[in-house]
């Protein structure tokens, strides 16, 4: 049974949990005070545009046309140049997906699919009042009636999958609740910059229910506890990339140099 403090801040998501654990002040800016990002990071704008291009391409829009539609929201020349470099791989990726669909008996494709579960991990609507944890899957394919392949697009620097374990496990917990016929799950990380898809070993339904689901609930409780004493700051290396840094009290702190006496070593 979730704690009251966890229920207060529901619905949770992977990014919401990680934000609470990293910096309670940022959590309050985003999820309690609901202040819009005053200074979105360039990589966030580029990543969002790339996701839009991939979404359109996977739904049948020609890759060049999909890229042009997504590029229209970017006004900075440097961001446009970075976007153009990344979208070179959109066409080859959709070709790989089409090849996969021809080789497998795909019953269903979903793109940018929003899922949610209740506190007992049964499925519910994304915006439902009883949603406890939720997420959006970039693309997934149900094939051969009992296999589900999930692909998550990443536009940043390629990282070891273990660094995204909580987010990826959350997708599996959500998917297991929504696709009841699935028995085996495959997770692929699409590294857009390197034009590669890195697949995890197959995950069984038993592994999701026995290990991943309890870990997810534990992480939510840890996040709720981290923000329970209010919006305290937690300065760290992430501050330089924070969109709220100009609003944060920690950015106003000044450290004075220490004066030593001449006769001290």
What do these predicted regions represent?
Residues 11-12, 94, 118-123, 129, ...:
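Metal-dependent nuclease catalytic regions and adjoining charged, substrate-binding loops involved
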Residues 14-62, 110-113, 244:
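Nuclease catalytic cores
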Residues 23, 50-51, 135-157, 170-171, ...:
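Conserved catalytic cores of phosphodiester-cleaving nucleases, focusing on short active-site segments
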Residues 41-45, 159-166:
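Short alpha-helix boundary/capping segments
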Residues 49-123:
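A non-catalytic, helix-rich entry segment at domain boundaries
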Residues 98-103, 129-132, 138-145:
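A short acidic-Thr-Gly-centered motif at the start of a beta-strand
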Residues 107-113, 131-137, 235:
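Short beta-strand or tight-loop elements
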Residues 109, 148, 183-187:
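Residue-level recognition of the N-termini of beta-strands and the immediately preceding loop/turn
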């Amino acid at each position: 049974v979730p704690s009251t403090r966890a229920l207060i801040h529901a619905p949770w998501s992977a990014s919401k949990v990680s934000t609470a654990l990293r910096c309670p002040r940022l959590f309050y800016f985003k999820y309690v005070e609901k202040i819009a990002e005053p200074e979105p990071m360039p990589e966030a704008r580029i990543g969002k545009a790339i996701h839009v291009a991939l979404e359109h391409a996977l739904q049948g829009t020609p890759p060049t046309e999909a890229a042009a539609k997504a590029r229209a929201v970017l006004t900075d020349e440097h961001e446009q140049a970075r976007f153009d470099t990344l979208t070179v791989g959109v066409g080859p990726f959709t070709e790989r997906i089409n090849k996969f669909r021809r080789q497998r008996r795909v019953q269903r494709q979903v793109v940018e699919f929003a899922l949610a579960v209740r506190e007992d991990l049964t499925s519910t609507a994304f915006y439902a009042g009883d949603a406890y944890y939720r997420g959006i899957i970039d693309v997934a394919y149900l094939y051969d009636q009992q296999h589900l392949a999930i692909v998550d697009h990443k536009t940043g620097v390629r990282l070891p999958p273990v660094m995204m374990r909580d987010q990826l496990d959350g997708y599996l917990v959500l998917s297991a609740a929504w696709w009841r016929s699935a028995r085996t799950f495959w997770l692929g990380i699409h590294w857009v910059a390197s034009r590669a898809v890195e697949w995890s070993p197959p995950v069984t339904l038993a592994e999701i229910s026995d290990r991943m689901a309890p870990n997810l609930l534990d992480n939510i409780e840890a996040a709720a506890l981290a923000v329970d004493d209010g919006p305290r700051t937690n300065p760290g290396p992430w501050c330089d990339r924070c969109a709220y840094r100009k609003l944060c009290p920690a950015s106003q702190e000044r450290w004075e140099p220490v004066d030593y006496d001449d006769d001290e070593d």
